[in-house]
């Protein structure tokens, strides 16, 4: 088994991941499939600080194509096109809104001290943003945000 998978499984067990998702994690054969599971369980993962920013830094820092961002400073607006985008310890400006080609409005999650400004992409929609403790978001230029707070149990 891969080192990343061993770590994910150990932390999932220690942090009380439900049996169904734990079994799904055991079946993950690639980082991409593990990321999909992470994004499907993102509320639980962020509430429990799973798997931890240290693991994300070490094993998933190259996962921007999958909507996982870590330690990024966006000087120029970064266009967000994923259905779920998770930012760990990120700062700067992102652009979000309706993705007409994919017919989605992204759900944006900020964790581990992320502070982002979100600007619109030209469509009048409301973008949901989920904030962990210690994170902040500012709406800019033609976007409406619906902000939810994720708290540690």
Can you say where each PLM-predicted feature lies in the sequence?
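Short, glycine-biased loop/turn motifs at secondary-structure junctions and
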Residues: 1-153
